[in-house]
Amino acid sequence: MFTAIWVMVGLAIAIGLILGWSAIRFKVEGNPLAEKIDAILPQTQCGQCGFPGCRPYAEAIAKGEADINQCPPGGEEGVKKLAELLGVEPKPLDEAHGTPKPKSVAFIDEQTCIGCTLCIQACPVDAISGAAKQMHTIIADECTGCELCLAPCPVDCISMVPIAEDLPHWKWKHPVVMMKQVGESTRV
């Protein structure tokens, strides 16, 4: 009986070691350029670029299958950052994919909401809370302002409310110039 247990323990250890070695040996690395591009994109998952989310768009840019100017939520600033990262000239935002809008969040008029759950199904970031035939509400901190919840609503109880520019949402609008650290040598 103990022999069978020791055989099973030995097999488990051997298989574990083989699996561990295989995981290290055959590890698939993601595209590091796509990772950097994805970090620049606004993560609204809105699909305005023609891709189902920011990650697929980043991968398409990295492969050269998409242009850098297809993201309206990222605006001109996003295009400039992508151009700088990729070492290409910035392009004007492609208006075929939409125009930049002020940052906003969805708001559900809970008196009008019929609880159909269509908005919940449409939200790519799960920023809508509610149940069938119950009123729904937006989790404002999670909402990216993608507007994907507007179209499926049969009673038009969802509206977009611009985010006020207060301290947590304020952003420096002027270009930031990187300063050299004291003592850093300059190249000639």
Curated annotation (Swiss-Prot):
Region annotated Hydrophobic, chain positions: 1-23
Keyword entries, A-Z: 4Fe-4S, Cell inner membrane, Cell membrane, Electron transport, Iron, Iron-sulfur, Membrane, Metal-binding, Repeat, Translocase, Transport
UniProt main location, coarse: membrane
Disulfide bond positions: none
Domain 4Fe-4S ferredoxin-type: start-end pairs: 104-133, 134-163
Family note: Belongs to the 4Fe4S bacterial-type ferredoxin family. RnfB subfamily.
GO cellular component: plasma membrane
List of residues binding [4Fe-4S] cluster 2: C113, C116, C119, C153
Gene Ontology terms, MF aspect: 4 iron, 4 sulfur cluster binding; electron transfer activity; metal ion binding
Binding site for [4Fe-4S] cluster 1: C46, C49, C54, C71
Residue span, 4Fe-4S domain: 29-88
Encoding gene per record: rnfB
Domain of life: Bacteria
Cofactor: [4Fe-4S] cluster
Protein known as: Ion-translocating oxidoreductase complex subunit B
Subcellular location: Cell inner membrane
One GO BP: electron transport chain
Function of the molecule: Part of a membrane-bound complex that couples electron transfer with translocation of ions across the membrane.
Originating species: Thiobacillus denitrificans (strain ATCC 25259 / T1)
EC assignment: 7.-.-.-
Entry's cofactor comment: Binds 3 [4Fe-4S] clusters.
Binding site for [4Fe-4S] cluster 3: C123, C143, C146, C149
Subunit structure of this chain's protein: The complex is composed of six subunits: RnfA, RnfB, RnfC, RnfD, RnfE and RnfG.
